[in-house]
Swiss-Prot record:
Keywords tagged on the record: ATP-binding, Cytoplasm, Kinase, Magnesium, Metal-binding, Nucleotide metabolism, Nucleotide-binding, Phosphoprotein, Transferase
Name of the featured protein: Nucleoside diphosphate kinase
This protein's record includes keyword Zinc: no
Alphabetical list of InterPro entries matching this protein: NDK-like_dom, NDK-like_dom_sf, Nucleoside_diP_kinase, Nucleoside_diP_kinase_AS
Family to which this protein belongs: Belongs to the NDK family.
GO molecular function terms listed in the Swiss-Prot or TrEMBL record: ATP binding; metal ion binding; nucleoside diphosphate kinase activity
GO cellular component: cytoplasm
Active site: 117
Locations listed in the record: Cytoplasm
GO BP term (any one): UTP biosynthetic process
Protein source organism: Wolbachia sp. subsp. Brugia malayi (strain TRS)
Subunit structure: Homotetramer.
UniProt-listed CDD domains: NDPk_I
Amino acid sequence: MAIERTLSILKPDTVKNNIIGNINSYIEKSGLRIIAQKMMLLTKKQAELFYAIHKDRPFFGGLVEFMTSGPVIVQVLVGENAISKYRQIMGATDPKQADKGTIRGDFADDVNENRVHGSDSLENAHKEIAFFFAECELV
């Protein structure tokens, strides 16, 4: 099994509703470790660059607006098969389709405000981590 790193973002709805500890508990119980974490307020430019893959999608403007509406927590998680493991504990993108016992199944109600982001591939994990963290910040 491969030890991987993945990016996690606890979105503004998570920070606003003060459930950061709840989400971190799900992460830690899954066997993943948080090796870097910081709170930040994304600028419009940062959000547009980070989500550039979606720039031609109808939800792009709303996504950028939401992701800049309040602080986020960006994290780097590490562990065996971290990317697929974190995606599994996040649950389906649409909380209505997410299983109970997943972050979105237990804490989210809306596909547009679904609490968390996680990298979807090893290649994207490398890019996304480098977007927010210098290598020296990863302990």
